[in-house]
Amino acid sequence: HPDGSLRALMRSKHERIAESISTNGGKTWSELKLTEMPNNNSGIESLTLADGRHLLLYNHATGRPDKKDGWGRRNILNLAISDDGTSWKLVGTIEKQETGEYSYPAMIQTSDGLVHMSYTWRRDLVKHVVVDPAELVPGESLSAEGL
C-alpha cells in the first residue's frame, strides 16, 4: 500500500474473508478482522497489480451452517478489483455452474502486464485464464449481504 502497510487476506470459517494488517514490514500483525467479502472456508488469491490496484479471485459464497468446518459450495468463482484493498467491486464471474466446483485459485502478473489465473475445474482439471488488467471494468460493489 502507498503508506507502506501490508494487508493479508485469508480464508475463514466465519463466512467472511479475514484480514490482518502490518505497519512494520511484517514484523507484527493486527488481530484478524472479518471483511465484508463472503467466504465459505475456501482458498482465495489476492494480487497487487503493477499499477497499484488489487485483484481478488474467490468463491462468492458463504459457508453451510450444518458443516462445522464452514465449507460451502464452490460453484461461483468471482474476480474482484479494489483501489485500496478494502472496498471491492465485481470485475466478472469467471465460473458459475450449479453443479460445478472451482477452487484453490492462484494468480500472477507477468512482465507483459497480463494476469494469469489458474484454479481447479470441477476437481478434474486445472484451468488457466488470462486477462488484461487494463481492460478490467469495475462493476457493482460486493459484500456478503443477500447471500
Predicted regions and their residues:
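Asp-box/BNR beta-propeller blade signature and adjacent active/binding-site loops
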Residues: 1-147
